[in-house]
Amino acid sequence: MPGHLQEGFGCVVTNRFDQLFDDESDPFEVLKAAENKKKEAGGGGVGGPGAKSAAQAAAQTNSNAAGKQLRKESQKDRKNPLPPSVGVVDKKEETQPPVALKKEGIRRVGRRPDQQLQGEGKIIDRRPERRPPRERRFEKPLEEKGEGGEFSVDRPIIDRPIRGRGGLGRGRGGRGRGMGRGDGFDSRGKREFDRHSGSDRSSFSHYSGLKHEDKRGGSGSHNWGTVKDELTESPKYIQKQISYNYSDLDQSNVTEETPEGEEHHPVADTENKENEVEEVKEEGPKEMTLDEWKAIQNKDRAKVEFNIRKPNEGADGQWKKGFVLHKSKSEEAHAEDSVMDHHFRKPANDITSQLEINFGDLGRPGRGGRGGRGGRGRGGRPNRGSRTDKSSASAPDVDDPEAFPALA
């Protein structure tokens, strides 16, 4: 019925790989114990003191092997104590010598708490039945790639293999980023597309209706290329170089191996070319000494000339009788007096000498007496009356025309 929830859920908790770690005991010791037991059984039928001593020695070796097995208990057995019923059976079996584990169905007891003995060496597994693995939808085997490393394009998105954790899809490093989801989405809702060589138009042409372009094996523009390209490109260049070198050697060998008696009638153009080549070959690198090289450099270098006047060059004879003139002290003093008079000359109506300007009167107002306002404040209010008297005495009256005689 729709909307009806499933009542029960199951989950497998046991470790299916637990049997892989069942290798604490040494198999060689187990085999030796089995051989000793066989010898003891064979020597028991023959009477005599020698047989008894051999049986005692075999029993001693068996006890030593059993003690070693008890010491080699794993940490898993210590952490998971066995139930009382299994512990009793285990104690009984420890008294007996160990038997080789070659027979099918016989395993070491006490390895897992959910297994119990039944009869002789038979183990009952009381674990819950495992659920069958879920069938993956749209799962198909991977298609084998071609030689050029081409990817299959005509396959629809639904038929691609599941890209879960450890899935078969082409993810980063062979493992998909989606947490077990096979639809190409990861946990953040971001879709991750497969990487194809070429453009997206050719990859999804059967969906978008565009013209399909065949792959070119990874070659051409807008393609990544194939792995074989790097391996095949380098030998080509090597073969070309080798072929050119061999061709030059073959030509030289042919010219050397021709006998002197044979006559050659080459074309005129070829003779001219050969002569030019010989002339070029004869001209080797020029060798010269250091002095010769410096002489060539000095010839090519441009000489710099300066028009420098020599001493007493172009001297005029009329200036030979000249001498230095010094000013007298009286003239210097008179010049200074004239400068001072000119600088301090005053007009007749200048009244600046009559004005008295005292900048100290325009300063801050004086502080009041101590103890003002309850005897605590230092800065009492200033005496306004004295301030007004001083300002009225110093400041001229603007309305009085006699205060400004120059303006009258």
From Swiss-Prot:
Omega-N-methylarginine modification, residue list: R165, R188, R216, R364, R367, R370
Biased composition (Gly residues): 164-182, 363-372
PTM entry text: Phosphorylation by MTOR inhibits SERBP1 and relieves ribosome hibernation.
Localization per Swiss-Prot or TrEMBL: Cytoplasm; Nucleus; Cytoplasm, Perinuclear region
Modified residues (Phosphothreonine): T226
Cross-link (Glycyl lysine isopeptide (Lys-Gly) (interchain with G-Cter in SUMO1)): K52, K102, K228, K281
Primary location group: cytoplasm
Residues the record lists as N6-acetyllysine modifications: K52, K68, K122, K140, K211, K329
Disordered, as annotated region: 33-292, 328-408
Ranges of biased composition (kind: Low complexity): 51-68
Keywords associated with the record: Acetylation, Cytoplasm, Isopeptide bond, Methylation, Nucleus, Phosphoprotein, RNA-binding, Translation regulation, Ubl conjugation
Disulphide bond pairs: none
GO terms, molecular function: cadherin binding; mRNA 3'-UTR binding; ribosome binding; RNA binding; SUMO binding; translation elongation factor binding; translation repressor activity
Record has Acetylation as a keyword: yes
Extent of Polar residues compositional bias: 240-253
UniProt tissue specificity: Expressed at high level in the heart, skeletal muscle and kidney, and at low levels in placenta, liver and brain.
Phosphoserine: residues carrying this PTM: S25, S197, S199, S203, S205, S208, S221, S234, S330, S392, S394
Any one cellular-component term (Gene Ontology): cytoplasm
Basic and acidic residues composition bias: residue spans: 70-80, 89-114, 122-162, 183-199, 261-275, 282-292, 328-342
Function: Ribosome-binding protein that promotes ribosome hibernation, a process during which ribosomes are stabilized in an inactive state and preserved from proteasomal degradation. Acts via its association with EEF2/eEF2 factor, sequestering EEF2/eEF2 at the A-site of the ribosome and promoting ribosome stabilization and storage in an inactive state. May also play a role in the regulation of mRNA stability: binds to the 3'-most 134 nt of the SERPINE1/PAI1 mRNA, a region which confers cyclic nucleotide regulation of message decay. Seems to play a role in PML-nuclear bodies formation.
Assigned protein family: Belongs to the SERBP1-HABP4 family.
Subunit structure: Associates with mature 80S ribosomes. Interacts with EEF2/eEF2; interaction sequesters EEF2/eEF2 at the A-site of the ribosome, thereby blocking the interaction sites of the mRNA-tRNA complex, promoting ribosome stabilization and hibernation. Interacts with SPIN1. Interacts with CHD3 and TDRD3. Interacts with ZDHHC17 (via ANK repeats).
Protein name: SERPINE1 mRNA-binding protein 1
Organism (species): Homo sapiens
